[in-house]
């Protein structure tokens, strides 16, 4: 029966993988729902307050770029040639060979530069033209040939074009997507969890599928009780910090994190899924690798280390077991549990795996940085070639002996090694950090310039264009059976109790890596959801034309911010009522859909604006004169934050104005402000229209 269950688990997992690759959106069992377009009013202010509504910020985001591109290509004729030119340059930069670049560079020059020059309508500088012409005359076609044009295209787009985008419906759609992104609260219900694929000291790793996009990931679940039992809280939190540091920017050579979340019992990391097994496994199955095969793995690992070191992260656990293969045979560095940030303080702890640890790591009290990883790389490459670490002779398992040899032994390299390989390994395995390759001031560049890698084009390595020496078999789960992986003995943690203080440690654990979420959405459901939302909004717009649209009421007025909230203000009502709210400098108005805005609170009536919690949900509490209370609930975290800020600012400014105005004697004050009255104070409009 156990065998049958294992087979069924494998089949289910493999089917999910295949369907995810073909049509991930079709595998989505949940649907992302975009908020109403009126969310723009609140979200624009929220993003502006954080410096996010700039050309650079929006253009550099995947979804921001796609919406800006759509606007320019389909709604702004003057910007269309600029964006088309930009896209052609980006395609050129990804070409694999010089021959392809020679042909394409000439086509781009003729279509987008010479044609415009002849028509006297070339909107770019003479320097940019001369830069490209000079290279083409010499038949030099580097990937960054058109970089001066990229800079000038962006300069031309960031002015009036960007301002028109901000005023368009495409920016409204950007606000809708950003609201979804900034309100992500993941739970186990957001994933379909498949078979176990690995186990570590604190928990297990599973294959899983994200419900709203259909994308496959690895879910690393750490048991909070086991963490507490082993006093591993610092290690668990450190791994989340290290993953967050290395998971931004384009690096296909590290197992990166897209999300982190926790439940009452578990910490969960959502990571890149690697289906091809690890190098330790393949070394045992395949036998030692040739120099050429090892060069392939070394090159990709070097780029992974370079990415980490550029972010001041030292990995500290480089070994074949931590190098995972994807289904095509390319590799990524995994498991950042021992990684460390050395940007502010260099570490001096002796951590890692014996036989791969650098001498400075083994020496007590000696501080080190990325130097440790280059020594470990030398040890690992030696193992790929010879089947054992250079300091683990005769398969000794004595850790003290291995450490002693690491600190004292001069490594003898076999005569069969090529001179270039000997030079590389001798440089990496230098005990003296000041003489070690990679530690002489230029980091990874020194290693990449080794004669051993002379035949490589590093751009081709980065683009993963070299054929892997080993391709994992398709249609197989390259992991041990669930039975062989085993499970934890729950008796171990039976007496461990998780206290409130334990849970407090993980209060800031949840995280979404913005660029990875946006990439996931763009690859899967972005177009589908945009099309569906467009249809829904068109129908609603037609209906609202008859009723009077909520946003129309704010037009031409001094409305600070407006949008939907739910209120609970009547002592006889226990249910939330969804209403559309308008904040003015001297009052807060609201109405139901299609109703006239008759209800309002003046700033004079409000005594304070506070945050409260009702059934574990954050709400806004407005304390009203006469001991009354008015509770507001927002649909998302950004809305709550922004409404609280705007209400407090309006209340404070109204109070200050009242204090500046001499009190009127013998004249009663009305608590209700007529809608026709002149506003108390003018603040910037954010009608979002």
UniProtKB/Swiss-Prot annotation:
Catalytic residues as annotated in Swiss-Prot or TrEMBL: 317 (proton acceptor)
Q: Where Phosphoserine occurs along the chain?
A: 670
Does Membrane show up as a keyword for this record?
A: yes
Q: What is its EC number?
A: 2.7.11.15
Q: Where does the AGC-kinase C-terminal domain start and stop, copy by copy?
A: 454-521
Query: Which residues does the annotated region (N-terminal) include?
Result: 1-190
GO CC: one term? Answer: cytosol
- A Pfam family: Pkinase
Domain RGS as annotated: residue spans = 54-175
Where does the record place the PH domain?
558-652
SMART domains assigned to the protein according to its UniProt record, in alphabetical order: PH, RGS, S_TK_X, S_TKc
Site description Required for receptor phosphorylation, residues in chain: 3-4, 10
- List GO BP terms, alphabetically: cardiac muscle contraction; desensitization of G protein-coupled receptor signaling pathway; G protein-coupled receptor signaling pathway; heart development; negative regulation of relaxation of smooth muscle; negative regulation of striated muscle contraction; negative regulation of the force of heart contraction by chemical signal; receptor internalization
Subcellular localization(s) per the UniProt record? Cytoplasm; Cell membrane; Postsynapse; Presynapse
What reaction(s) does this enzyme catalyze? [beta-adrenergic receptor] + ATP = [beta-adrenergic receptor]-phosphate + ADP + H(+)
Entry keyword annotation includes Transcription regulation: no
Q: Which residues does ATP bind?
A: 197-205, 220
Q: Give one GO molecular function term.
A: protein serine/threonine kinase activity
Query: Which InterPro entries does this chain map to?
Result: AGC-kinase_C (IPR000961), GPCR_kinase (IPR000239), Kinase-like_dom_sf (IPR011009), PH-like_dom_sf (IPR011993), PH_domain (IPR001849), Prot_kinase_dom (IPR000719), Protein_kinase_ATP_BS (IPR017441), RGS (IPR016137)
Quote the record's activity regulation: In contrast to other AGC family kinases, the catalytic activity is solely regulated by the binding of substrates and ligands, not by phosphorylation of the kinase domain.
**Domain Protein kinase spans what residues?**
191-453
The family note in this entry says: Belongs to the protein kinase superfamily. AGC Ser/Thr protein kinase family. GPRK subfamily.
What is the recorded function of this protein according to its Swiss-Prot or TrEMBL entry?
Specifically phosphorylates the agonist-occupied form of the beta-adrenergic and closely related receptors, probably inducing a desensitization of them. Key regulator of LPAR1 signaling. Competes with RALA for binding to LPAR1 thus affecting the signaling properties of the receptor. Desensitizes LPAR1 and LPAR2 in a phosphorylation-independent manner. Positively regulates ciliary smoothened (SMO)-dependent Hedgehog (Hh) signaling pathway by facilitating the trafficking of SMO into the cilium and the stimulation of SMO activity.
Print the domain comment field. The PH domain binds anionic phospholipids and helps recruiting ADRBK1 from the cytoplasm to plasma membrane close to activated receptors. It mediates binding to G protein beta and gamma subunits, competing with G-alpha subunits and other G-betagamma effectors.
UniProt name for this protein: Beta-adrenergic receptor kinase 1
Organism listed in the record: Mus musculus
Report which gene this protein is encoded by: Grk2
């Amino acid at each position: 029966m156990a065998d049958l269950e294992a087979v069924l688990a494998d089949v289910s997992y493999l089917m999910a993988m295949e369907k995810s690759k073909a049509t991930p959106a079709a595998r989505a069992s949940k649907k992302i729902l975009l908020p109403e377009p009126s969310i723009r009013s609140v979200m624009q202010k929220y993003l502006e307050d954080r410096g996010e509504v700039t050309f650079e910020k929006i253009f550099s985001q995947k979804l921001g770029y796609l919406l800006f591109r759509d606007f320019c290509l389909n709604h702004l004729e003057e910007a269309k040639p600029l964006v088309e030119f930009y896209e052609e340059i980006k395609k050129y930069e990804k070409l694999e060979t010089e021959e392809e670049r020679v042909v394409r560079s000439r086509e781009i020059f003729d279509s987008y530069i010479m044609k415009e020059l002849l028509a006297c309508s070339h909107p770019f500088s003479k320097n940019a033209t001369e830069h490209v012409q000079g290279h083409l005359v010499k038949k030099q076609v580097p990937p960054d040939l058109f970089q001066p044009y990229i800079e000038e295209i962006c300069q031309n787009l960031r002015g009036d074009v960007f301002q028109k985008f901000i005023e368009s419906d495409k920016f409204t759609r950007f606000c809708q997507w950003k609201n979804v992104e900034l309100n992500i609260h993941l739970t186990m219900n957001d994933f379909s969890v498949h078979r176990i694929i690995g186990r570590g000291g604190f928990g297990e790793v599973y294959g899983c599928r994200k419900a709203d996009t259909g994308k496959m990931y690895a879910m690393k679940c750490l048991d909070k009780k086991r963490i507490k039992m082993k006093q591993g809280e610092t290690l668990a939190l450190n791994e989340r910090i290290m993953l967050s540091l290395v998971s931004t920017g384009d690096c296909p050579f590290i197992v990166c994190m897209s999300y982190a979340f926790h439940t009452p019992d578990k910490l969960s990391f959502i990571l890149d899924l690697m289906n091809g097994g690890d190098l330790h496994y393949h070394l045992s199955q395949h036998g030692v690798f040739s120099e050429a095969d090892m060069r392939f793995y070394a090159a990709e690992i070097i780029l992974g280390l370079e990415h980490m070191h550029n972010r001041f992260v030292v990995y500290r656990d480089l070994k074949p077991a931590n190098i995972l293969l994807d289904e095509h045979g390319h590799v990524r560095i995994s498991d950042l549990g021992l990684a460390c940030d050395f940007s502010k303080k260099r570490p001096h702890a002796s951590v890692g795996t014996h036989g791969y640890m650098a001498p400075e790591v083994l020496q007590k009290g000696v501080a080190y940085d990325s130097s440790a990883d280059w020594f470990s790389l030398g040890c690992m490459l030696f193992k790929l070639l010879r089947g054992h670490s250079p300091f683990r002779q005769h398969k000794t398992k004595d850790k003290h002996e291995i450490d002693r040899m690491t600190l004292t032994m001069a490594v003898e390299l076999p005569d069969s090694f090529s001179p270039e390989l000997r030079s590389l390994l001798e440089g990496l395995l230098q005990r003296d950090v000041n003489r070690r390759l990679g530690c002489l001031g230029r980091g990874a560049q020194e290693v990449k310039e080794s004669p051993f890698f002379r035949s490589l084009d590093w751009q081709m390595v980065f683009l993963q264009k070299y054929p892997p020496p080993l391709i994992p078999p398709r249609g197989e789960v390259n992991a041990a059976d669930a039975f062989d992986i085993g499970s934890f003995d729950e008796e171990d943690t039976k007496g461990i109790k998780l206290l409130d203080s334990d849970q407090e440690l993980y209060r800031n654990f949840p995280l979404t890596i913005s660029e990875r979420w946006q990439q996931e959405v763009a690859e899967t459901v972005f177009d589908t959801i945009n099309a569906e939302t467009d249809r829904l909004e068109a129908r609603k717009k037609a209906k609202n034309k008859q009723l009077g649209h909520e946003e129309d009421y704010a037009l031409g007025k001094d409305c600070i911010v407006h949008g939907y909230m739910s209120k609970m203000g009547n002592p006889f009502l226990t249910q939330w009522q969804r209403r559309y709210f308008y904040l003015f400098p001297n009052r807060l108005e609201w109405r139901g859909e299609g109703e006239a805005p008759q209800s309002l609170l003046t700033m004079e009536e409000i005594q304070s604006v506070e945050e409260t919690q009702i059934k574990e949900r954050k709400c806004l509490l407005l304390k009203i004169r006469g001991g009354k209370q008015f509770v507001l609930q927002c649909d998302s975290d950004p809305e709550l934050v922004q409404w609280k800020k705007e209400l407090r600012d309006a209340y404070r400014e109204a109070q200050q104005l009242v204090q500046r105005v001499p009190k009127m004697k013998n004249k009663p004050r009305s608590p209700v402000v007529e809608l026709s009255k002149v506003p108390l104070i003018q603040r910037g409009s954010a009608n979002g229209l």
